[in-house]
Amino acid sequence: MLERNFQAKLKKELKEMFPGCIVTKNDANDIQGLPDLTIFYKDKWATLECKKSANEKKRPNQEYYVDKMNEMSFSRFIYPENKEKILNELQQTVKS
């Protein structure tokens, strides 16, 4: 599965999981390494860096921004192999 296809399906799933949320696609050309998606739900926010598989190479600065944003709120690398785990973690974080 291509990353963009995984990302499109994930966006739909997030909108179903968190009714009324806003999911934005971040511009990789603006800040290199910034996670792909930002999710705003009620008074919470999270970012997700989408990968087409667990083996896909990380690009420069991605690890840095995922770690930094995770310290601020919630941020993870997400791919088909860990999607359910990450979405469960996100749900627990957002609903707390």
Name what the model sees in each region.
Residues M1-S96:
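Catalytic phosphate/metal-binding cores of nucleic-acid and nucleotide-processing enzymes, i.e., regions
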